Each structure stands twice: as C-alpha cells, then as structure tokens.
Amino acid sequence: MTDALIFLAPGYEEVEMLTVVDMVRRAGLVIDMVSITDTLEVTSSHNVTIKADKLFKEADFDSAKMIILPGGIPGTPNLLAYKPLTDKILEFKENGKLLSAVCAAPTVYGQLGILKGHKATCYPGQEVNLNCAEYLTEPVVIDGQFTTSRGMGTCLLYTSDA
C-alpha cells in the first residue's frame, strides 16, 4: 500500500525530490519514486542519476493518497508533457485526492487548469503559469487538496506541512 507517489522526469530537481522522499519516509509513510521514462534510472537537472522504485506502469495509483511533483527544468515541462501522468493528475483532482508540487512544478497543475479558484505558490517568476485564483509568496500554501511550495529552500517546511 502506497501513501504517496513522487514522479521523476528527466531534469527533475534532485534536492527537492530527495528531501521530500527522505522526510516522508522518516515520518513512517510509504512513498514510491516513480519514473516516467522506460527505465528506473532518471537523471536530474544537475546530472545526478537516481534509481526510481517503480516504472509508471507499476505505480499503485489506487492506494496512493497523494501525487507529488518535484520541480526542475526541464523536469517540470517533461512532467507536463507526459499524458499518462496528466491523466492521473486529473483523475486525482476529480476524486478529491491530494496534489502537491514544489518549485516550478505547481505550474503543471496550473497549466492543466485545476488551480482555478485556489491559492498557490511556486518558484518566483513562474507564477504566470499558475492560473490560480491567488498567487501567494508564502513558502508553502495549502488550499483544499493542493499543497504547493516555492522551491528547494522550502522543502523541509513543505514536507512537515504536506
């Protein structure tokens, strides 16, 4: 049984991803690192290769309560471009499950149009892509089923809140 799924796309931000995974596991929850590529090994924006726990097709979406998206460039655009993931994000939204994202990644939710009517935050300069009701400069914003965070420097606070 999986509590959360965090997705690795080529070019993800490794500190954001690993901080979230580490803190969630320290809290005693099950989080799976899921590759959206055809291999478990995924390389970050800073050329660090990490082995995911599962491929996308193996992820346990039924038991997962939360989707988490780490930021990074080109990781964030790669997440948005992966239709199987965006379909699952829309399904989670419809079913009232939790959606969470750090740094530039909240813009994935924004570009899917699901942040409308919600408050959110993201990496400074990316807010034009949030398409939300209200952009906040807080380190972490929780609004309904969404938790968003500004970036790498806010990850410890983010994981304690999420």
Q: What positions do the PLM features span?
A:
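A short, Lys/Arg-enriched amphipathic alpha-helix followed by its capping loop at the start of a domain
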Residues: 20-29
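Short N-terminal binding/cap micro-motifs at the start of the first secondary-structure element
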Residues: 12-17
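Conserved small/polar residues in nucleotide/adenosyl-binding loops
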Residues: 158-162
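Phosphate-binding/catalytic loops
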Residues: 98, 140-152
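Flexible gly/pro-rich beta->alpha loop and the following alpha-helix that scaffold active-site loops
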Residues: 32, 36-96
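A conserved active-site-flanking secondary-structure segment within enzyme catalytic domains
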Residues: 115-140
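Catalytic nucleophile loop
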Residues: 67-71, 89-115, 120
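Extreme N-terminal starter segment of soluble prokaryotic enzymes
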Residues: 1-5
